[in-house]
Amino acid sequence: MTNHHDRASSSFGLSGFLRHSSFVIRASGLYLNPLSIFHFLCEFSQMRRAIYPGSFDPVTNGHLDVIERARKLFDEVVVAVAHNDEKQPLFSLKERLDLLRETAGTIGGVRIAEFSGLLVEFARAESAGAVIRGLRAVSDFEFEFQMALMNRKLDAAVETIFLMPKEEYTYLSSRIVKEIARLGGDVSSFVPACVAKALGRKCS
């Protein structure tokens, strides 16, 4: 006989981890789970601030879509630009911050910041209870799942919330946009106008 716990585990999948997100994954694909949304509303209703980290090299329309979705759930969203000396971004840290301030920074309740070191330490310093991650496709999930579990291990008080952008942005990434720009393609439908101009200057 299957007990209540077994039924709940099978509903959420992956050892219950996905009860903290707005969807579950089954062989048939992604779909919204009303019960997981209920858990979200109950457990995160007191959270006022969330961190949306990334390299944003550069910011795309997909990023902005996730930011706007996150803003509907939290009083403040801190868009945190990672400073990583091991990477060689196309845009400098200052340029990425400026582009974000010109785009995402115009959304009410959104603040732009930079960080280095452990994400959970930055979240703690900002008194943020959640980290926002965008999922474009199932292929993103394995890496994000591992990172979310590691962050939970480092600080169980910081939860990870997965948000999916509009379908039209599921294929979009900064890497693809930069490649199109380098090849002389039109990126105006993928990024804000100021970013398209900046890419044109960088890649000309």
Language model segments and positions:
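Intrinsic disorder/low-complexity segments
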Residues: T2-Q46
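Nucleotidyltransferase catalytic core that binds NTPs
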Residues: E43-S204
